[in-house]
Regions:
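A mature extracytoplasmic/lumenal domain signature
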Residues: 43-45, 56-59, 69-71, 90, ...
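Envelope-exposed proteins and targeting segments
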Residues: 35-37, 49-53, 82, 120-122, ...
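Positively charged n-region of N-terminal signal peptides that target proteins for export
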Residues: 1-5
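The feature marks short-to-medium sequence segments in extracytoplasmic or secretory-pathway proteins
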Residues: 47, 58-111
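N-terminal secretory signal peptides
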Residues: 24-76
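Bacterial N-terminal signal peptides
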Residues: 7-18
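Surface-exposed edge beta-strand/loop patches
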Residues: 24-30, 111-153
Length: 153
């Protein structure tokens, strides 16, 4: 009985990870370095010179996932996802999360953790790559990098 309940709960989490009924499928997915952690890029849209990355983290593990694993290890803001960056292989450029005048990231922040057996919808903003760039790499600390993530404009 317990196995059926856990299986049903994980199936529900996977639906949340995939988005609501009728929602578009993620444009890219990857696994975390730790077992039971996955990430799905919902979209990467460019408007007005800014790229917005929307993504979901799914924690199927038995322990919470601390957001500090996704922060910038050098100048990062605790409880944020400011360690994410984009890689433009064609132009050999790395795009970091945009920061405001107070050096706070324009990203999901003031976060604690993704609870066990749950998911979280997150976002981050970057300088827009040139119009000629149609796909880009997305690197999230402690997740396998994703190459060729499509950019919508």
């Amino acid at each position: 009985m317990r196995g059926k309940i856990i299986g049903a709960a994980l199936a529900g989490l996977w639906l949340a990870f995939s988005g609501p009924a009728g929602a578009a499928e993620p444009v890219a997915t990857t696994d975390g370095e730790a077992s039971g952690i996955r990430l799905a890029v919902q979209d990467l849209k460019v408007a007005n010179g800014v790229a917005t990355l929307r993504f979901t983290v799914l924690n199927e593990a038995d322990t919470p996932l601390n957001y500090n694993t996704m922060r910038d290890p050098n100048n990062g803001e605790g409880g944020s996802v400011d360690g994410i960056y984009l890689i433009d292989a064609a132009n050999k450029k790395k795009y970091l999360v945009v920061k405001d005048a107070d050096k706070h990231c324009l990203c999901s922040r003031n976060l604690e953790h993704v609870a066990s057996k749950s998911s979280a919808n997150l976002w981050a903003k970057f300088p827009a790559p040139p119009d000629s760039v149609q796909k880009i790499g997305v690197v999230v600390p402690h997740f396998i990098p994703m190459d060729d993530v499509p950019i919508s404009r």
